[in-house]
Amino acid sequence: MGILDAIKLGKEKEVAHAKTVRKLSGLEQAIKQRPPPRDFVGAVAERAGNGTVALIAEIKKASPSKGLIRSDFQVAAIAEAYRDGGAACLSVLTDQTFFQGKPADLELAKAVSGLPVLRKDFMIDPYQVHEARAMGADAILLILAMLDHGQAIELEAAAQAMGMGVLIEIHDEPELERAMAMQSRLIGINNRDLATFAADLTTSERLASKVDRNRIVISESGIGGHGDVIRLMEAGINGFLIGEQLLRARHIESATREIAQARLHACP
């Protein structure tokens, strides 16, 4: 069994249990008490459209491939550092089993940062989309490697019906074809091989050229810093989802600013 299969099996059990604890009607009532979602897609599009870096800065305590990422894990301080460093949006892990995340992390990050926030989790059921909106998320991630096309369309529609943005994550050409048959403008290219966990930036470079011009490419995973960002910008990519590199920095705000202010220099 591969890592995604194991994650999906565990998530199915988790969602089934959650439905017994809190009914969908309860989530719908909570959603009514929330203000409208912040414009996640618009925040990314504004930066990417003028040629500057659209940085989605990620908050996560741990990962399956790297274990504990930051021992001094203070969500509010990290969210503020990301905002002050120039991030366009935040991505917050809410998966407990593999990333040691929780919904309260998302709620806190959104409250202190004032930025649009994406719920980063393994979405397999419309119930989770309602959960995301109830906890205050402005966008969700859909990993096409975990979903058949019907499921992906259903989850995208559920999010859009509540005014949320959707980041569609792909790893290869067949998934890209599926993504371009969906409505969301945001296509995330994950550079990490899900079997080996090795990251290769050529994945983004290769696939970005095949993405329709009306979409916005977000390069994800394995981005080591300013030099990698410049390399990917040279391939026409202006959107980046970065977590580990920033979280391991001694000064998160400065590390964020270095990425957010990266620019291509015009040839004389």
From Swiss-Prot:
Supply the enzyme class, top level.
lyase
Concerning Gene3D superfamilies, the annotation shows: Aldolase class I (3.20.20.70)
Q: Name one GO biological process term.
A: L-tryptophan biosynthetic process
Q: Which PROSITE patterns match?
A: IGPS
Q: In which pathway does it act?
A: Amino-acid biosynthesis; L-tryptophan biosynthesis; L-tryptophan from chorismate: step 4/5
For this protein, the Enzyme Commission number is 4.1.1.48
Does the record bear Ribonucleoprotein in its keywords? no
Which terms in the Gene Ontology molecular function aspect does this entry carry? indole-3-glycerol-phosphate synthase activity; phosphoribosylanthranilate isomerase activity
What SUPFAM superfamilies does the annotation carry? Ribulose-phoshate binding barrel
| UniProt xrefs under InterPro entries | Aldolase_TIM (IPR013785), Indole-3-glycerol_P_synth (IPR045186), Indole-3-glycerol_P_synth_dom (IPR013798), Indole-3-GlycerolPSynthase_CS (IPR001468), RibuloseP-bd_barrel (IPR011060)
Give the superkingdom in one word: Bacteria
User: Mind telling me which Pfam families this protein's record contains?
Assistant: IGPS
Catalysis: reaction(s)? 1-(2-carboxyphenylamino)-1-deoxy-D-ribulose 5-phosphate + H(+) = (1S,2R)-1-C-(indol-3-yl)glycerol 3-phosphate + CO2 + H2O
Please provide the record's keywords in A-Z order.
Amino-acid biosynthesis, Aromatic amino acid biosynthesis, Decarboxylase, Lyase, Plasmid, Tryptophan biosynthesis
Please state which protein family the record places this protein in: Belongs to the TrpC family.
PANTHER family of this UniProt entry?
INDOLE-3-GLYCEROL-PHOSPHATE SYNTHASE (PTHR22854:SF2), TRYPTOPHAN BIOSYNTHESIS PROTEIN (PTHR22854)
Q: Which HAMAP family match?
A: IGPS_B
What is the name of this protein?
Indole-3-glycerol phosphate synthase 2
Source organism = Ralstonia nicotianae (strain ATCC BAA-1114 / GMI1000)
